[in-house]
């Protein structure tokens, strides 16, 4: 059983860029997406999919569903695969029971926590590509709603809601790809 501390995790990362902020949309709910469905593929059920996204003025709240075949925690081979694409993951600031960075827990942490950090890294990369300076932090939080059923919630702050949704979609695709390769 997970302790309260391992059920909840927070992350913050400062991007290297700060573009103009998109207008706030208020609360918007988007339907679930799974990368394979978007491509029109009839592939097996993805390991990770987003069931629901609510976009708020300052953050988006994402309900994430893991398939029954999906591990609930990360493992070294998965981390190695993700580090090839996201080498800065271990340096992310992260409140956790073992240290102050994501690197302290990344080899054995809830998979939704991994998804949170990959999405943040995608947002940081997007911000960095736009400009060269920023004082904006991206903050995330993840927690299980029902770990037995594989249902979790990831919350992410953003500067641009569309870029944040794109980052989440990319993160889901990359985590699914990495899980498939392990």
Question: Positions of the model-derived regions?
Answer:
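Non-catalytic terminal extensions that flank enzyme cores
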Residues: 2-96
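Intrinsic structural disorder/low-complexity segments
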Residues: 11, 116-120, 176-179
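Intrinsically disordered, low-complexity interaction/regulatory regions of eukaryotic proteins
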Residues: 23, 27, 33-37, 103-111, ...
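M16/MPP (pitrilysin/insulinase) zinc-metallopeptidase core fold and M16-derived inactive scaffolds
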Residues: 85-157, 161-163
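Intrinsic structural disorder
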Residues: 1-2, 58, 75, 104, ...
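M16/insulysin-pitrilysin zinc metalloprotease superfamily fold
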Residues: 155-182
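Generic alpha-helical propensity signal that fires on short helical segments
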Residues: 78-82, 130-132, 170-176
